[in-house]
Curated annotation (Swiss-Prot):
This is Uncharacterized ABC transporter ATP-binding protein YhcH. The keyword Cell inner membrane does not apply. Pfam families: ABC_tran. Keywords: ATP-binding, Nucleotide-binding, Transport. The lineage of its organism: Bacteria, Bacillati, Bacillota, Bacilli, Bacillales. It comes from the Bacteria. GO terms for molecular function: ATP binding; ATP hydrolysis activity. Transmembrane segments: none annotated. The keyword Nucleotide-binding applies.
Length: 305
């Protein structure tokens, strides 16, 4: 897939303190890319530099190959962004808000406004005043504003903040639709691990302004040695039969750390001992597990971030 945004050694120093430390990575079209990290990790600061709201101390951001520092006007036209909360005129209707925003962008027609309204699912309420909108509807109206000029990259800072579960799901579904149907790159930041796992294709894990790692959220590749769970009828007997393996006994089976190629041999051993097997599955690490491993934080610290 084509690279649409690239960070090259991006650094931010404030009063002698390094807030963002030498970030470099690329983002591709058609993917939802997440910034994950606790509050204070540097997610919003990075986004502000990506959209030109904050100067870089070092490095550069390339948007569709154009430099945010040297060709700002050309680069920023490819971006649609909501940093923190969408700014809306609450005493105007949703439609009037979009008309106001359209005046700042060349070539936005009535048909285009109608198109984005339908895309974000606000057709039935677009002529109501924004002050009557729920928080989720305001987020969707902000999303519509961002889409009026057909950006290649959509950047959203904490897009699900304050939303109820239904509102979170709505936003998530709309973002996936944009990547799937329009090939847009969507960049989101959040400290909510469970939501990022559902929303993103890849994530960059930030901690104290540094890039810890970039991971595929739904990585189907099983590690060379992974943990497998064997649900059996006689767990204690199974543990005895398999005592040469690194295993952990459970009430309804055993967990064994082994290579994928060894699984058939383990099954054969159990069958030979007439131990009934009901299920064999790999125990995959959740995004939370991987995040905690890489950052060294506890579950309690993440939950209160």
């Amino acid at each position: 897939m084509k690279t649409v945004l690239e960070l090259k050694n991006v650094t931010k120093n404030i009063r002698g303190r390094t807030i963002i430390d030498d970030l470099s990575f690329t983002i591709r079209e058609g993917e939802v890319f997440g910034f994950l990290g606790p509050n204070g990790a540097g997610k919003t600061t990075t986004i502000r530099m990506m959209v030109g709201l904050m100067k870089l101390s070092k490095g550069d951001v390339l948007i569709c190959g154009q430099s945010i520092t040297k060709e700002y006007a050309k680069a920023i036209k490819h971006i649609g962004a909501i940093v923190e909360n969408p700014e809306l005129y609450k005493f105007l209707s949703g439609y009037k808000n979009l008309q106001q925003f359209a005046r700042m962008v060349k070539g936005v027609t009535k048909e285009k406004i109608d198109e984005v309204v339908e895309l974000v699912g606000l057709t039935d309420r677009i002529h109501d005043k924004v002050k009557t909108y729920s928080l989720g509807m305001r987020q969707r109206l902000g999303l519509a504003q961002c889409l009026l000029h057909d950006p290649k990259v959509l950047i959203l800072d904490e897009p699900t903040n304050g939303l109820d579960p239904a509102g979170i799901r709505e936003i998530r579904d709309h973002l996936k639709k944009l990547t799937r149907e329009r090939g847009m790159a969507v960049i989101v930041s959040s400290h909510l691990l469970s939501e990022m796992e559902l929303m993103c294709d890849r994530i960059a894990i930030l901690q104290k302004g540094k890039l810890i790692d970039i991971q595929n959220v739904k990585d189907e590749n099983i590690d060379e040695n992974d943990t497998y769970f064997f649900q059996v009828e006689q767990p204690s007997e199974a543990a005895t039969v398999l005592n040469q393996y690194d295993l952990l006994s459970k009430t309804n089976g055993v967990e064994i750390k082994l290579a994928k190629e060894e699984v058939p041999a383990v099954i054969e051993l159990l069958v030979m001992q007439q131990i009934r097997i009901y299920e064999v599955k790999v125990i995959t690490k959740s995004l939370e597990d991987r995040f905690l491993e890489m950052t060294g934080e506890t579950k309690e610290e993440v939950q209160h971030a």
